[in-house]
Amino acid sequence: LKKNMDVEWGYSGDKGPENWASLCDWFARGAEFPLQSPIHLTKGEETKIEGDTLSFHYQKQRFTDKEFKNTIHLVPFDQLSYVEFKKERYYLTDIHFHLPSEHIINGKQEDIEFHFVHMNSKKENLVVGVMYQLMVQEGWLYNQENGESWNLEKHEHWVNPDVFFPEQKSHFHYIGSLTTPPTSGPIQWFVMDHVGKLNQEFLLPFDGQYARPNNRPIQPLNGREIYYFEEFEQ
C-alpha cells in the first residue's frame, strides 16, 4: 500500500474531512478502522473506572517547529520526555494543536486542543489531549526564570512539556484513531478533563494560515468503552 505523503487534504470542500477516505488508498485503509477519533466524552454511569495509571516523565528539552499537515508541530531533538502506561514507555515525538478543540467534553467544545503524540518501541502511538480557553491577560505558557524560551525566528525552543498540563491530571481514556489522514488506529487516547488557560498571544506568530479551524468533526462511538481516571489533589 503506497503511503503517499504528497496527497493534499484540508478541512473544507473537496479535500475536507468528509472526503478524506476518497483521496487515496492509504487514507481509505485508515478510515476502515471502526473506532475513529475525536469523540464526545462524558462522565456518566457507563463510564468505566480506569485501573491503570498514566505516569508522566517529562523534562526540559530542545524543540524545533515545523509546518506540515495543516498546523505547526513542535518536534523534540532528542528522545527524553516520555509517559508510561502498563509498564510500557512511550516517548514524546510531536506536539501540535487544533482550533477549536477536536474532542468535546460533556457537551462543551473548547477554544484549542493540544495533542502530545508519543510512540513506543513497537511503533505504537499514545496521544494525550489537553484543552484550553484562550485568554487575553492571563495564561502564559513559559517561565523565563526557569530558563524556558520560545524563539520562532531560530526555530528553537527550550521547554518542559509539563507546562502545558494541569496540575491535576484526571483524564478520559479510550481507544481511537489519528484525527488527521490516514486516520488509522488503534491509538491509546488520553484526554485531560481539566481545561487550562492559554494567552492568545501564543497564536500571534501563527496568525493567518495556522490560526484557522483545523478540527475533525466528532466521530461515532460505535459501542466502545470510555474509561475515567480521577486524580485526587495531594
Regions found by a protein language model. Name each.
Residues L1-Q234:
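Alpha-carbonic anhydrase
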